[in-house]
Swiss-Prot record:
Gene3D superfamilies in the record: P-loop containing nucleotide triphosphate hydrolases (3.40.50.300)
Protein name according to UniProt: ATP-dependent rRNA helicase SPB4
EC number(s) per entry: 3.6.4.13
Biological process terms in GO annotation: rRNA processing
Complex formation: Component of pre-60S ribosomal complexes.
One MF term in the entry's GO annotations: ATP hydrolysis activity
PROSITE patterns per UniProt: DEAD_ATP_HELICASE, HELICASE_ATP_BIND_1, HELICASE_CTER, Q_MOTIF
Top EC class, one word: hydrolase
InterPro entries for the chain: CTT_SPB4 (IPR056330), DEAD/DEAH_box_helicase_dom (IPR011545), Helicase_ATP-bd (IPR014001), Helicase_C-like (IPR001650), P-loop_NTPase (IPR027417), RNA-helicase_DEAD-box_CS (IPR000629), RNA_helicase_DEAD_Q_motif (IPR014014), SPB4-like_CTE (IPR025313)
Biased composition (Basic and acidic residues): 535-553, 563-576, 583-618, 625-637
UniProt domain comment: The Q motif is unique to and characteristic of the DEAD box family of RNA helicases and controls ATP binding and hydrolysis.
Principal location class: nucleus
A cellular-component GO term for this protein: nucleolus
């Protein structure tokens, strides 16, 4: 009787790791749906757990988060004793607050399976209750992001609960680490993780990153994780990794008998369609209607925040019935961003996230079926990150980028050279026409005419889009001189073209072929409409000119008395400062020793934050002064 051969164990099985994973970690990852390691986890964990620095480049949606959380957690929990009070053992730096929050969420889920850590976690939600003391190593995380808490609240949390793992965006981390009560000595600090490393090393984050590194010991484990690391190699060397292991996990597909490297998941279909600007949104609507399976989660990328603000009102005019639309961009208030992002994640009906490149990198958005880029991104590196929102973790996905006819079609070859091949979208067949474009333009303009506020949004959005287009890095492909401005006016439903440098030499119809009674074109918002009417009446009666003359005389008079007023103000400030110091002294005399220490800590942090704010304001003022010559001067009412 033939005996059955034992099943061959997968090289990506969790029990193949050496050193082996703790049993509770294996239980945790199993509940998260990871029956075995993803390729990036299988390649990274042995090295990072084996006390080596790593530089990891892997396709988006490949499980990078657990690839650094598991080694970090395992290393800290295998220490001989708990982390000392107010000492930090590990730091994870993320470029955005959303990504930092998601990493924190994954870590919290992981720690629910570790008994000592799980007992502490509920106490972290109560600011008035200190966490229980533990004699065995445990993970105590703290999330540091702007917009949800103040720096004073962050320091208070740190002093009360003594977290040993910080997950933060760069700016907020610098503020906390500037406190003399936050310690990262070589005896305690173990691991630094830079997630989305190439973005962290961009010019905008470089100063903050240097300050963070200056607080950390050189004897540490460092991991850099990103979807594209090669273009930031020079910066990575400066970070100070010690003989790092470079790990590159790419997907290889068979095409015509030839293995071809790709930077996106094989389950993702990468396509493009060539459409005039006026047909792009009708094409999007037809794509949503024609797909054989209705996408439950879709992401539509626009170039600017102002474009999102405008098209969130316009897209519902043309979307198929049953689709909800959620806007998200970086200029939303933190609470609005969080609310809209959670709304998109929790939606049970077909939903479209209308967004900018804020959602292109790092955000863990599961089960995205469709990604549409209305315009190609100005930075070619962002293209794969936008497209990679779909097709994550083996799920099938479709990504479509829309290109204008002509020179923009060279973008296809440009991407192929960068090992990101895209093919024409063949199924479903999208057959939009000039009639469809004209119908959409009329529908949009009719809608915009109902509220002058929409006209203002359209003008602002179009100007910002034109500037963004002119900032394309692939300047030989995306040239403002090649744009069909009249067609773009129809695409945006403009009532007239705005005044802007890009249209200086354009001789087309700046009124878009429309005759509009601008005097009676009203705002829906009553306050704004009242202000408009008052301004209109003043302009007609000539009061405005008189007002300007009177204002000039008044300012001149005020300037003459400025010195005297300034001296009086200095005296008032000095008196207020004396009163404040007297009150502070009285309050301090009534404090206990512990309260005095805490107050000193808060005062130190507040002083440091104020100093940094002054430096930041001065830098921004200098930058604004340099850019003043190219500033947009506005448009006609």
């Amino acid at each position: 009787m033939a005996t059955e051969k034992p099943k061959k164990r997968s090289p990506r099985a969790w029990d193949t790791l050496n050193p082996p994973l703790s049993e509770w970690i294996r239980d945790a990852v199993a509940t998260m749906g990871f029956d075995q390691m993803t390729p990036v986890q299988a390649a990274t964990l042995p090295h990072f757990m084996g006390n080596k620095d790593v530089v990891v480049e892997a396709v988006t949606g490949s499980g990078k988060t657990l690839a650094f959380l598991i080694p970090l957690v395992q290393k800290l929990l295998r220490l001989s004793e708990p982390t000392k009070k107010h000492h930090v053992a590990a730091i994870i730096v993320s470029p955005t607050r959303e990504l930092a929050a998601q990493i924190h969420t994954v870590l919290m889920k992981l720690l629910q399976f570790h008994e000592a850590s799980a007992e502490i976690l509920p106490h972290l939600k109560d600011d008035d209750e200190k966490r229980p003391f533990t004699t065995v190593p445990a993970i105590v995380p703290q999330l540091l992001v702007g917009g949800t808490t103040t720096t004073v609240q962050d320091l208070r949390f740190f002093l009360r609960h003594s977290p040993n793992v910080l997950i933060s965006s760069p700016g907020r981390l610098v503020e906390l680490m500037s406190s003399p009560h936050v310690h990262c000595p070589q005896s305690s600090f173990e691991v630094l993780v830079l997630d989305e490393a190439d973005r962290l090393l961009d010019l905008g984050f470089k100063p903050d990153l240097q300050k963070i590194l200056s607080h950390l010991p050189k004897q540490r484990r460092t991991g850099l994780f990103s979807a594209s690391v090669s273009e930031a190699v020079g910066e990575i060397i400066r970070v100070g990794l010690r003989n790092p292991v470079k790990i590159e996990v790419k997907v290889k597909i068979k095409g015509g008998g030839i293995l071809e490297d790709r930077k996106t998941p094989a389950s993702l279909q990468m396509t493009y369609m060539v459409k005039p600007a006026s047909q792009k949104l009708p094409a999007l609507a037809e794509l949503l209607r024609q797909l054989p399976v209705r996408p439950q989660r879709s992401i539509v990328f626009l170039s600017t925040c102002a474009a999102v603000d405008y098209f969130q009102h316009i897209l519902p005019l043309i979307l198929p019935e049953g689709f909800a639309l959620v806007p998200l961009h970086g200029k939303h208030a933190a609470k609005v961003r969080e609310k809209n992002f959670n709304k998109f994640l929790s939606s049970v009906s077909p939903t479209i996230l209308l967004t900018t490149d804020l959602a292109a990198r790092g955000l863990d958005i599961p089960q995205v079926d469709l990604v549409v880029q209305i315009d190609a991104p100005s930075d070619p590196k962002v293209f794969i990150h936008r497209s990679g929102r779909a097709g994550r973790a083996g799920r099938k996905g479709l990504a479509v980028v829309m290109l204008h006819p002509g020179r923009e079609e060279d973008y296809v070859q440009f991407l192929e050279i960068r090992k990101t091949p895209i093919a024409p979208l063949e199924k479903p067949t999208i057959t939009t026409s000039e009639d469809d474009a004209a119908e959409f333009a009329k529908k949009t303009r009719d809608f915009v005419l109902t509220d002058r506020g929409l006209f203002d949004k359209a003008q602002k959005a179009f100007v910002s889009w034109a500037r963004s287009y002119g900032a394309h890095q692939a300047t030989s492909i995306f040239r403002a001189a090649d744009l069909d401005w009249a067609d773009l006016g129809n695409a945006w439903g403009l009532l007239r073209m705005p005044r802007m440098p890009e249209l200086k030499g354009w001789t087309g119809d700046k009124m878009c072929g429309l005759e509009i009674d601008w005097d009676n074109y009203a705002y829906k918002e009553k306050t704004r409409e009242q202000q408009r009417k008052v301004a209109l009446e003043e302009e007609k009666s000539g009061v405005k000119k008189q007002d300007k003359s009177e204002e000039f005389k008044r300012k001149r008079k005020n300037n003459e008395a400025w010195s005297a007023k300034h001296e009086k103000e200095d005296d008032r400030v000095e008196r207020r400062e004396k009163r404040r110091k007297r009150r502070d002294a009285e309050a301090t005399s009534k404090m206990t020793d512990d309260e005095k220490v805490k107050q000193m800590e808060l005062n130190d942090l507040i002083a440091e934050v104020r100093r940094q704010n002054r430096e930041k304001a001065a830098a921004e003022a200098a930058a604004a002064k340099q850019e003043k010559d190219g500033e947009f001067k506005g448009f006609d009412d």
